[in-house]
C-alpha cells in the first residue's frame, strides 16, 4: 500500500517542503508517501473561478492512482481524532488499496472530484493555508503509523 497527497496550488515554500520531506522520510518504512502538486487553474479579473476549479479537477483525476481509496479534504467533511485516523489506516492496510488524499484549490474540489471521494475529511473548523494542510496531513499520517507500530512518537 502506498499513499499519495495530491495538492492543488503553487509550489510550496521551502519551510513547507522541508517539513513535508521530514515526515515523508519518517513515514517511508511504514507507508510510502508521495506528494503530487497540481497546477492551479487560472484565476483573476474576467476569469470564471468555476472553470479554474473544473480544470484543476481534471488534473487531479489524472493524478489519482488506479483503484485508490480517495479521501478529499473539505471543510464540511468529517473530523477525525489521531486515534481514529490510526484505526482507519489499519483498516486500509487490510484492504491493500493505495490511498489518495486530496487538497483542493481556493474554491475547493470540482464536483467530479467530490463525486469520486470515498470519504471527505475536515482538518477542523479553523481556516488554514492549504500549504500548512500538507504538513498537517503528513504529520498525522506519520502519527497514525507510529501509533500502529507502538512507536513512542504519540504519547496521548
UniProtKB/Swiss-Prot annotation:
Top-rank lineage group of the source organism: Bacteria
Compartment(s) of residence: Cytoplasm
Catalytic activity of the protein: pseudouridine(1915) in 23S rRNA + S-adenosyl-L-methionine = N(3)-methylpseudouridine(1915) in 23S rRNA + S-adenosyl-L-homocysteine + H(+)
Record: residues binding S-adenosyl-L-methionine: 73, 104, 123-128
Keywords attached to this entry: Cytoplasm, Methyltransferase, rRNA processing, S-adenosyl-L-methionine, Transferase
GO terms under cellular component: cytoplasm
EC number: 2.1.1.177
Keyword Cell cycle: no
InterPro entries: Alpha/beta_knot_MTases, RlmH-like, tRNA_m1G_MTases_N
CDD domains xref list: RlmH-like
Recorded GO MF terms: rRNA (pseudouridine-N3-)-methyltransferase activity
Entries under NCBIfam families matching the protein: PRK00103.1-4 (NF000986), tRNA_RlmH_YbeA (TIGR00246)
Its biological purpose: Specifically methylates the pseudouridine at position 1915 (m3Psi1915) in 23S rRNA.
Assembly with partners or alone: Homodimer.
Full protein name: Ribosomal RNA large subunit methyltransferase H
